[in-house]
Amino acid sequence: MSDNTRNDATGGGIDPALWRGLTQPRLSRRQALGVAGGGLAAGIFLDAAAASGASLPNAKVGTPSWWKKQNLHHTVNFANWPLYIDTLKGKSLSLDHFTTTTKIKVNYFTVIDDNTSFYAKIRPSLAAQQYTGYDIVVMTNNNPPLGYLIELGWLIPLDHSMMTNFNKYAGPLVKNPAWDRGNKYTMAWQSGWTSVAYNSKQVKNPGDSVQLLFNKKYAGRIGMLSDPFELGSVGLLALGIEPATSTESEWSKAAKLLQKQKSDGLVAAYYDQSYIQHLKNGDVWVSQAYSGDIYQANLSNKYKDLVLMIPKEGLMMWTDNMCIPLYAQNPKDAMTLMDYYYSPVTQSVVEYYNDYICPVPGAKQQLLRPTGWNKGALSALKPEIGLPYSATANSPLVFPSGREQKLTKTYYQFKNQDEINAWTSLFLPIIQGA
């Protein structure tokens, strides 16, 4: 997608949900996982486990003494998702500034389209104890591959002495996360929410509960996501169960609830990205939804009636995480770049372009009152983005309030393939009609 397309969308000529939003690409990669019945064949995990033995080949890798021996090589290879960094005329202003100030060249690769296929791509190199070609990779916490990389010892523990900006500016949602206690292996890149949305023209008294998805008053007008991980998680929330600490017996209870929802005729369909269009068209009144789609839809006066709920049971938050794969050739350069993105000045530029949940709360003030190199960068981006800086700074979907932060929930972290199989065997049949 070009920057011009982005600008046209802002002007109202193109549906704003089509341009880069908070969560749009998140769905495509989740769908790739879901359609595959959990995303990973058992052989991928088992082969990896046999090759690695779930331990580092060199136990000293990632220790303070190991890090002290590492040197800057003035190059870093960074693998990320497409359309996920500030871009102007084909270049990233933040990456250019990093190179200018540190003399570290960044080779930036947009090679990750979904977690599963990318994991399958780098797994053979890791199993063979070889460099993957990347010093930084970005993986999502609610998909199995990140857990596999951690469990198999295929990520280098971070050098916390080089996390100055992170320690000072990282927000509470990304510090000490459930999927990586102490941020041993990861630093968040960006985050997003999965929640419930409704059309306020048809739904007059929505309340503040995910139970709206199970209200018979809206039978045939309710949309659910066709991602088994999202579907199962909202079922658990509806039962008052914390997804992150849930058990297989509780998964079964959630599946029964969701099957009843379907059998009772409440569900119009199980949607991929198309759910947002059905909300806009008015044939679906209530739906599971990604925060970014609603944010983008609200940019058009035509869709101001679409509302994202903040349910009392909580919002599911996914996070894309920067991490350093084992055998990386430029780990110190990688650490330098990762911490650079935790400067509020830098993050304000990224966030103005991305509009995701920002990992650095201080970037809000830098958007409202730029004080550094970001002033020129933001000014350069503004004609392409077509929105005031305050549109990003004042959005609770980018800079959540304390209430939203308290209601944020994390996904269950699968420990092995058997757990993935157990989950998908319960929730995929609901989606697929079995």
Set out the residue ranges of the language-model regions.
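A structural signal for short loop-to-beta-strand junctions that line the ligand-binding cleft
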Residues: 67, 130-138, 156-195, 221
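Conserved C-terminal helix/tail region of periplasmic/extracytoplasmic solute-binding proteins
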Residues: 391-434
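N-terminal twin-arginine translocation
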Residues: 21-31, 41-65
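A bilobed periplasmic-binding-protein/Venus flytrap-type ligand-binding module shared by bacterial periplasmic
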Residues: 195-202, 236-241, 318-333, 349-352
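Ligand-binding pocket segment of bilobal, Venus flytrap-like solute-binding proteins
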Residues: 146, 221-227, 231-235, 243-309
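Mature extracytoplasmic/periplasmic domains
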Residues: 325-403
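N-terminal secretory signal peptides
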Residues: 1-27
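Early extracytoplasmic/lumenal segment of secretory-pathway proteins
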Residues: 56-144
